[in-house]
Design a protein with these regions (language model features):
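Basic, amphipathic "hinge/linker" alpha-helix immediately C-terminal to the N-terminal HTH DNA-binding motif
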Residues: 543-554
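Short, Lys/Arg-rich nucleic-acid/phosphate-binding segment
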Residues: 533-543
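Conserved P-loop NTPase motor module
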Residues: 1-21, 25-32, 36, 216, ...
Length: 559
């Protein structure tokens, strides 16, 4: 009886040669199985010659184990790089539409090329008209404005006055119960500022009292409370014994939320600004904040978006992408183990996919990332690693039993990819350089560029109708009836620009992303337009077409 181990070795050799020689290797392996011992020995010698000819001797055992997918398996509408094997670029690799909402993790040491692939991801998202939000920790992404296709992007300098933003996390998103929001927001504060259960208790008491006084629970809000109000309330709390120590930590955290740029950011009575950025292509520069403040702001934004999307009807259809740098601060494995349970951010990461949101994590220390985050990432892209703990963490995630040492030998721009779906084995890709002049875009250029793009925040009275979490919407143009002027203009634009993306269409019509989305939804509900997945020069895009009813209305707008 033939040695079973020898059969496995021959099978592995055929698999390694198949990407180079194609289906011919399937035929050779089938012949090997059918031959007698002498015939198998001849085939073994032949395979060794083929391997010597086509697989370079410099190709390490670990790299040789990274067997590439077929060209058909590697194809995707959103190209990320070239499949690399035996020192050769074989064919493009890309993600597919339905894979984005299952999330992506891009991991590698500093300088390995993570930001480069981040640039490429944003470019392909713009080409497919998919909105994105970038949490930029080191002011890396503003230079994309030098590219014409990124002129639809807005850049905000969080905590700095160049292009400021306001966001009051105490205002719950539409449809969210204030008490539910209070508890989740307090957990986010505790994570960011390393607070214990005693401080959580006092925070809950303070925010609850402020909500009660402002009429939040009774839908009678005239002016939304801010963290300054919570700080004032906390200072008047009567505490004794251990609670006095808890109060000291509570005041420390609340003071951070009310000081300097963080105070300007958070202490607003309106959320028009944050609602605006969640509907477009936006880069948020966070270098003006401390590490703890960055963590709180990012987590609060993600929590707000999660609950905001819950109130919408989009389910499991790729709607937008969020790119998060330094992700271990947001999804911390250490914090998860301290609480002994899934954190609010872990829950958000796991659930937000249902609402059409793709999260892309970038980090250099996967060993510090939450296990929930790594376990719930469909695509893992691992670039060069230098730390043994990180290499071990990634070898487990990538299911590299014997080839983990390759993670320490990857060149800049190379990565090992593992998908939890169409391609069963990890494989190697090469990511092209995104040529960009770093440091080209200055603060003054950002100020001038953004002066007409920043949302009008209105007066400080914020929500004045007494509705909890109700979003304030500017009045639409036209008379508000069927076939009004704005609807007719939208229908005409569909005829004149049939393959246009929604961002460009809204810009031509002078609409914000929110206003345009509302108008489009109304036309869909009336049966005047329909969405179709079609192929354009930019690739496969969701396009808008008039229905017969829409064409009739355009021909006879007065009827």
């Amino acid at each position: 009886m033939a040695d079973k181990g020898n059969f496995n070795n021959i099978r592995q050799l055929c698999l390694r040669l198949r990407p180079i020689l194609g289906v011919r290797m399937d035929q050779i392996y089938a012949a090997y199985l059918a031959e007698d011992p002498d015939g198998r020995e001849q085939i073994e010698h032949y395979l060794e010659l083929l391997a010597a000819k086509h697989i370079p001797q410099s190709l390490g055992q670990e790299e040789a184990e990274l067997i590439p997918p077929s060209q058909e398996q590697a194809q995707g509408e959103y190209p990320l790089g070239q499949v690399l094997y035996s020192g050769k670029h074989l064919y493009p690799f890309g993600l597919r539409e339905n894979e984005w909402i299952q999330h992506m993790a891009i991991l590698g040491r500093s300088g390995s090329g993570k930001t480069n692939i981040g640039f490429s991801i944003l470019k392909t998202l713009v080409q497919h008209d998919k909105p994105f939000l970038v949490f930029d920790w080191k002011r890396n992404y503003r230079d994309l404005l030098a590219w014409p296709e990124f002129h639809v992007v807005e850049v905000y300098t969080i905590g700095r006055s160049i292009a400021p933003l306001t966001f009051n996390p105490l205002i719950p998103p539409t449809g969210t119960d204030p008490k539910t929001w209070l508890k989740k927001l307090n957990e986010v504060i505790a994570h960011a500022y390393c607070l214990g259960n005693g401080v959580l208790y006092l925070l809950q008491q303070a925010v609850d009292a402020v909500y009660e006084e402002a009429g939040v629970y009774d839908n009678l809000v005239q002016s939304w409370p801010t963290f300054k109000d919570v700080l004032t309330k906390a200072r008047t709390m009567d505490t004794r014994g251990r609670e006095a120590g808890w109060l000291s930590s509570t005041l420390r955290a609340l003071s951070s939320l009310c000081f300097g740029g963080m105070g300007d950011l958070l202490n607003s009575s309106s959320n028009r600004s944050i609602d605006h950025i969640l509907d477009g292509n936006v880069i948020l520069e966070l270098d003006g904040l401390s590490q703890a403040d960055k963590t709180f702001f990012v987590q609060a934004c993600l929590l707000y978006l999660h609950h905001k999307k819950m109130a919408e009807n989009v389910r499991e259809h790729f709607d937008r992408c969020i790119l998060i740098e330094e992700a271990h601060h947001i999804l911390s494995g250490q914090r998860t183990s301290l609480t002994g349970a899934e954190s609010v951010m872990d829950t958000t990461y796991r659930e937000i996919r249902e609402f059409g949101v793709s999260l892309v994590l970038l980090d250099q220390m996967p060993s510090k990332l939450s296990g929930f985050a790594l376990a719930n990432s469909y695509a893992t892209i691992c670039m060069s690693m230098s730390n043994r703990a990180d290499i071990n963490a990634m070898s487990q995630t990538l299911l590299l039993d014997t080839g983990k040492d390759v993670l320490g030998t990857l060149e800049v721009g190379q990565a090992v990819v593992k998908l939890q779906g169409r391609i069963p084995r990890p494989f190697l890709i090469s990511i092209p350089e995104f040529r960009i002049e770093k440091g080209r875009v200055t603060d003054e250029q950002i100020r001038d560029y953004m002066k007409d793009k920043m949302p009008q925040l209105g007066t400080e009275d914020g929500v004045s109708d007494g509705t909890v979490g109700e979003e304030q919407e500017p009045m639409e143009k036209g008379d508000g009836g069927p076939g009004n002027a704005l609807e007719i203009a939208f229908l005409k634009d569909v005829v004149d620009n049939p393959d246009s993306g929604v961002a460009a269409r809204y810009k031509r019509l002078g609409l914000s992303g929110r206003q345009g989305q509302k108008l489009k939804t109304g036309l869909l509900d009336q049966g005047l337009i329909e969405e179709q997945l079609g192929t354009t020069q930019a690739g496969r895009l969701m396009t808008i077409r008039l229905t017969e009813q829409g064409r009739q209305l355009l021909l006879n707008p007065g009827e």
